[in-house]
Amino acid sequence: MTKNEYRLLTSRAVNKIGNVIYDYGNSSWIAGLGVVGQKYLGYYQLVDSLIALFLNPIGGAIADRYKRRQILLWTDAIGAIACGLLTFMPSKQGMLFGLITVNAILAISHAFSGTSFRAYVVTLVKEERLVDFNAHLEIISQIISISSPLLAFWVVDRLGLRPALLLDSISFALSFVCLWSITTKETHLQPKSGQIDIRHLLTDIKEGLDFIHREKEIFFLLTIATLVNFFIAAFNYLLPFSNQLFNRSSSYATMLSLGAVGAILGALFANKYFKNNYQSLLIALGISDLGLAMLTPLHLAKVSTLVLASGNLWFECFLTIFNIHFFSMVQKKVPKALLGRVFSSIFTLAVLLMPLATILMTALPMSVNPLSFSLIGFGISLTSLLAYIYARQHFM
């Protein structure tokens, strides 16, 4: 990899560390406030979803109109300053409202930085290296997802919330420094890029939607991602009930741990054994569902918890391969000037369908059942099969 690729990966890694530590430390601190904490933790989590829903489309338009590196620098700087100032909050009540406020600020920042980062990647990474870069990004993300909560627990438990916030501030500052050292010129900017108002933003968003509707391959990829996210949301709703469903106290933790291992394995295999084309993409998606389908018969066979959880390892492994090739294909097929808006559409639709899946799982009386894992797997399998038939007729 080039120096700029290393710097971009390092920036993303330390930025994610800051986000994970902030979310874990603050959620556990708020939850520890008792009845009051339960109410405010709901507010804390609701802020994320609402901001993502309303600001993702705007974030994509901004990412296409301005320099993406500057957007990332601004969001890192805001995160560093906000977390740093929060360490000086004197009272518990002030800290509580401060945490919710800063969480809203970070959620706003993420609405802009998430799409900007995915779109900025193509400025630094050559097309033939996109799959490899996205695989490295996934490996780093999974390692941080496993290790950062442990670090956050140690810091909050031993040192308290304020040192954790200071660590957050430092991580955002380090991410800023890594990005600052990248000087590659961005080529996606158009002559109109200096103008900005609500009308121009709405026009930009419409241009992005028109492009997605006009380009059948991009619309196809977006449809697949939306349907897959629906089933993943249903799976994520069901997963915390693993201990009760499988009558084992360690099922949930083991499923999560092996799922993370599967994601790392998927990132390692993505570029070695799968090509970046529709056939590989949809085969990986179709194979992934076997992991979920295995959970129900493995439970009935009364195998060990480790063997049972290997179904989630399989699922996450091939789902990660699908995700890596999906994002790489979008980055290759979409013009640089429109990447921000296309990615914002992907993220927005994902946010829209996740609550729908959760509502459906909540409303159905028998949804919390071991059989539901297999049904979700069947839904993913059917999606991949229909998508494969369509792609074979039109794109392959």
Which positions does each model-derived feature cover?
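Substrate-agnostic recognition of the 12-TM MFS/MFS-like secondary transporter fold
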Residues: 7-24, 44-61, 67-82, 98-157, ...
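A single, central transmembrane helix in multi-pass transporters
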Residues: 13, 161-163, 204-265
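MFS 12-TM fold signature
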Residues: 78-86, 106, 171-175, 287-295, ...
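Hydrophobic alpha-helical transmembrane segments
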Residues: 96-107, 132-189, 253, 257-258, ...
